[in-house]
């Protein structure tokens, strides 16, 4: 399996675990300049994902990172695109309808992606070059990449 896909899977699982830890507490909701909500779960998940993706030396576009000017980004051949908690409004409602989204894009086309649903522990991942996509249900967030691949 592609090493970057493995990194994205592990990052999404660890982020999902942190998201659920926050979900099970009383948490505050802040609002960003665009009036969209922001919670501790968004921040923790973003920090975790960044800790895995930064060492790849591939630029990251994340909803929760400081945005890089388009004049710089337009020259990136490859980048990560991340939404640490896609569905923050649903997270706030605690309805389970939120995901961790991580994609790797080259030449404006996705080459791999991970979607993790922490509330249900459903993991979706794909490698476009291999023309393969997977869905698996995990028992726990602390699943190793070896265990994911064995499912």
Residue ranges and their predicted role:
Residues 43-44, 114-116, 148:
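Short, intrinsically disordered/low-complexity patches at protein termini
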Residues 1-85:
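N-terminal subdomain of lithium-sensitive/metallo-dependent phosphomonoesterases centered on the IMPase/IPPase/PAP
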Residues 141-151:
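Phosphate/pyrophosphate- and phosphate-bearing ligand-binding catalytic cores of soluble enzymes
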Residues 67, 130, 140:
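Residue-level detector of flexible, active-site-proximal loop/helix-junction positions
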Residues 73-134:
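DPxDG-like acidic metal-binding loop motif
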Residues 135-141:
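Secondary-structure transition/turn motif
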Residues 23, 127, 137:
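Short, flexible helix/strand-to-coil boundary loops that buttress conserved ligand/catalytic motifs
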């Amino acid at each position: 399996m592609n090493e970057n896909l493995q990194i994205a899977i592990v990052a999404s699982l660890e982020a999902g675990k942190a998201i659920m830890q926050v979900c099970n507490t009383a948490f505050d909701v802040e609002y960003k300049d665009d009036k969209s909500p922001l919670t501790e779960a968004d921040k923790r998940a973003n920090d975790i994902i960044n800790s895995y993706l930064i060492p790849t030396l591939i630029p990251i576009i994340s909803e929760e990172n400081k945005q890089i000017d388009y004049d710089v980004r337009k020259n990136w051949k490859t980048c990560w695109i991340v939404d640490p908690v896609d569905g923050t409004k649903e997270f706030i409602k605690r309805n389970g309808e939120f995901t961790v989204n991580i994609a790797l894009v080259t030449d404006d086309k996705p080459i791999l992606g991970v979607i993790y649903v922490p509330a249900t522990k459903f993991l979706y991942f794909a490698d476009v070059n291999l023309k393969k996509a997977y869905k698996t249900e995990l028992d726990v967030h602390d699943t190793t990449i070896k265990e994911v691949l064995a499912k």
